[in-house]
């Protein structure tokens, strides 16, 4: 990671740009998120605002989705609060089903996965997603990767004690790679 200006000046090969970032803490409960998703929604909204990106520009969501009933439903509520009617149309995935919950490393691994998905315009599936919860009501990519066309995504990390973080990632402004070496 480096400042975009420095990367451009040195002619670096740029894979993506972190357009916005925000953290919040809803302090709802030591281990459970606010069930209405309000704390997570504030993080997503603040990250979009930080990046000057409209919710309408988001074409993919890499969810925290740790497969906890309370956490997943709260995250779905947060997505509905921020994206409104579009929330059921934006492809959502989580790589935890494929790689497990890597705790402190999860955010970094999921960010790399998000960047690769954007570069390839191909969203990885949520592995081992067998019994959809009707309370989620989102367009969860499962079974097979999905071809997609998007320029911006959100990457969510929501943790114990109501810690909420969101990255807004956009296509590289210059030197965009077209495939992975």
Where is each model-derived feature located?
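Condensing-enzyme catalytic core mediating Claisen C-C bond formation in acyl metabolism
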Residues: 1-51, 59-60, 129, 174-181
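Acyl-CoA/ACP chain-elongation machinery
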Residues: 21-35, 63-73, 89-139
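Short acidic capping loops at alpha-helix termini that bridge into adjacent secondary structure
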Residues: 54-59, 87-89
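A generic structural signal for alpha->beta connector loops
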Residues: 15, 87-89, 150
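Stable alpha-helical structural segments in soluble proteins, enriched in small hydrophobic residues
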Residues: 43-51, 78, 82, 114, ...
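Conserved beta-strand-centric core segments of catalytic alpha/beta enzyme folds
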Residues: 1-6, 106-181
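Conserved beta-strand positions
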Residues: 60-63, 155
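Active-site-proximal gating segment of KS-fold condensing enzymes and close homologs
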Residues: 71-85
């Amino acid at each position: 990671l480096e400042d975009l200006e420095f990367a451009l000046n040195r002619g670096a090969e740029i894979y993506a740009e972190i357009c916005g970032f925000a953290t919040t803490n809803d302090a709802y409960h030591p281990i459970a998120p606010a069930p209405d998703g309000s704390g997570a929604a504030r993080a997503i909204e603040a990250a979009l605002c930080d990046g000057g990106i409209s919710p309408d520009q988001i074409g993919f969501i890499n969810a925290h989705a740790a497969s906890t009933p309370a956490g997943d439903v709260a995250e779905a509520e947060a997505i509905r609060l921020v994206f409104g009617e579009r929330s059921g149309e934006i492809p959502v995935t989580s790589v935890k089903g494929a790689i497990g919950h890597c705790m402190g490393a999860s955010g970094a691994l999921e960010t790399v996965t998000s960047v690769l998905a954007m570069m390839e315009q191909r969203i990885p599936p949520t592995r081992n997603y067998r019994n959809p919860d009707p309370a989620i009501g989102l367009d969860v990519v499962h079974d097979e990767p999905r071809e997609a066309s998007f320029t911006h995504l959100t990457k969510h990390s929501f943790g114990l004690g109501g810690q909420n973080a969101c990255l807004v990632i956009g296509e590289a402004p210059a030197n965009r790679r077209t495939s992975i070496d």
